């Protein structure tokens, strides 16, 4: 992944986007990018991900990010959810809150929320206006 770009600008699908959102929670993107690059190389889709990973192996893999048990749980649950998700409200996906919803709206729905609070998303919005 390119260091200057946001993770959201470098993923191939909505599932990867949401995994990135979960991994970025309380963690700098410089730590997250190498882990996601390897994860998505091995399993680029949610279906492939569920065939390869379980909670324990994922926890070990994402250990460098910290909070690895919590993140693994959220990623596993979100991945199951996304396979049934209607693509509307991102907060219906397990582990996805306001930041994830705002990010999804910006990058996938071309809808700029007026109440964005995340500083990186604000910077991105300012740059596209």
Describe these PLM feature segments.
Residues 17-23, 75-128:
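Catalytic DNA-binding helix-loop module of base-excision-repair DNA glycosylases/AP lyases
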Residues 1-87:
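N-terminal polyanion-binding entry modules of DNA glycosylases/AP lyases
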């Amino acid at each position: 992944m390119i260091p200057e770009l946001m993770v959201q600008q470098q993923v191939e699908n909505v599932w990867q986007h949401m995994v990135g959102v979960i991994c970025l929670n309380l963690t700098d993107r410089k730590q997250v990018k190498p882990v996601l690059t390897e994860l998505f190389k091995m399993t680029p889709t949610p279906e492939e991900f569920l065939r390869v990973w379980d909670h324990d192996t994922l926890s070990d893999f994402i250990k460098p990010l910290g909070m690895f048990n919590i993140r693994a749980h959220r990623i596993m649950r979100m991945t199951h959810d996304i396979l049934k998700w209607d693509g509307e409200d991102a907060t219906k996906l397990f582990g996805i809150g306001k930041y994830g919803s705002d990010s999804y709206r910006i990058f996938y729905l071309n809808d700029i929320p007026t109440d964005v609070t995340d500083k990186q998303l604000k910077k991105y919005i300012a740059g596209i206006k």
